[in-house]
């Protein structure tokens, strides 16, 4: 018996009945021979980690643009924190940890430069709109490996596609593992963005709404602990009642929504980031404008997309893959004069 089959058999003994068993995956778009030692979701995890798009996350903004401190989150650090939170919840629920890890590590592969500012600019540019979760799937299916894609399992792609959305009416992933990542993403970013905001001097601990802090906890670690435990125990209750879904309790969920709204009002859309937001928008818009008019200068992969799917699509894919630094350097290369000594 192969090592992979031993792992799959162990899943049958260990995992919850609502988990996604690796040997029940609906598969990939392109058929492949199974790996001898890794399950299909382990293979997906490894492909994501070794992809160029994953490495570029270290140079993409989470919230604070061009911060020079060593401890502010980048998109890569956010991704790793999401993976940690999601795996903690998943192990407590006896779900498939490898599927959770693959979805969590891949969920932001398509995020643009300059955080959600890049997403907003590309959304205005691309007919039909731009969403980072959809772009993450596109990166995995079409952009990576020079257009071949990573050929991930459909469960991982589904989890990546449906990790966004905060309301109860948002579409959810078809697996419990995907639903866990959706909550872990929110738990991670709300709490680490508060931490970064305090580090940047925008917020003080005492600025946080007292009624919310009394429910969720005074520190970041306390809030994460509260949210993770509530998610685990409330989900167990749901399963026991025949309602198989991942969720928070009403009290904790309502407090969490209020805390997120506080962040949007005071940080994401607040005055502190307004000037930097305008600068980032200007850089992105000018680089987009240049390559829209000169798309023949883009790498071959994106030129081919322009010919097959239109210039807007090809330029969007190229810009979305840029890091903050690369996009800024492109702007400087295109628009800033080079000073030459005569």
Swiss-Prot record:
Which residue numbers delimit the HD domain? 75-190
Q: Which UniProt keywords apply?
A: Hydrolase
Q: Name one Pfam family in it.
A: HD
Task: Kindly give the InterPro entries that the UniProt entry links to this protein.
Answer: Diverse_Catalytic_Enzymes, dNTPase_2, HD/PDEase_dom, HD_domain, PHydrolase_assoc_dom
What top-level branch of life does the organism fall under? Bacteria
What's one GO MF term for it?
Answer: triphosphoric monoester hydrolase activity
Q: Which family does it belong to?
A: Belongs to the dGTPase family. Type 2 subfamily.
This protein is called Deoxyguanosinetriphosphate triphosphohydrolase-like protein
Upper lineage: Bacteria, Bacillati, Bacillota, Clostridia, Eubacteriales
């Amino acid at each position: 018996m192969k090592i992979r089959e031993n792992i799959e058999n162990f899943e049958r003994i260990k995992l919850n009945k609502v988990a996604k068993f690796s040997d029940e995956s609906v598969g990939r778009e392109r058929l492949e021979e199974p790996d001898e030692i890794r399950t299909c979701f382990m293979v997906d995890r490894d492909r994501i980690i070794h992809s160029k798009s994953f490495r570029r996350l270290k140079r993409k903004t989470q919230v604070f643009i061009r911060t020079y401190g060593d401890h502010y989150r980048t998109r890569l650090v956010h991704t790793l924190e999401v993976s940690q939170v999601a795996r903690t919840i998943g192990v407590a629920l006896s779900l498939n940890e490898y599927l959770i890890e693959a979805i969590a590590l891949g969920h932001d592969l398509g995020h643009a430069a300059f955080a959600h500012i890049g997403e907003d600019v590309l959304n205005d540019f691309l007919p039909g709109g731009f969403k980072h979760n959809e772009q993450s799937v596109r990166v995995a299916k079409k952009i990576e490996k020079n257009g071949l894609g990573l050929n991930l399992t459909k469960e991982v792609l589904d989890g990546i596609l449906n990790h966004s959305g905060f309301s109860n009416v948002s579409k959810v992933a078809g697996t419990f593992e995907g639903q866990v990542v959706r909550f872990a993403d929110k738990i991670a970013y709300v709490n680490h963005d508060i931490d970064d905001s305090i580090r940047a001097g925008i917020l003080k601990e005492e600025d946080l709404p007292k009624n919310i802090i009394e429910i969720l906890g005074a520190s970041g670690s306390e809030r994460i602990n509260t949210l993770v435990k509530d998610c685990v125990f409330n989900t167990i209750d749901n399963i026991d009642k025949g309602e198989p879904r991942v969720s928070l309790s009403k009290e904790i969920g309502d407090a969490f929504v209020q805390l997120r709204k506080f962040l949007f009002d005071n940080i994401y859309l607040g005055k502190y980031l307004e000037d930097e937001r305008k600068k980032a928008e200007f850089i992105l818009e000018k680089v987009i404008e240049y390559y829209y008019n000169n798309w023949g200068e883009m790498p071959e992969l994106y030129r081919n997309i322009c010919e097959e799917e239109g210039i807007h699509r090809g330029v969007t894919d190229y810009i979305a893959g840029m890091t903050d630094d690369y996009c800024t350097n492109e702007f400087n290369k295109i628009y800033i004069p080079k000073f030459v000594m005569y």
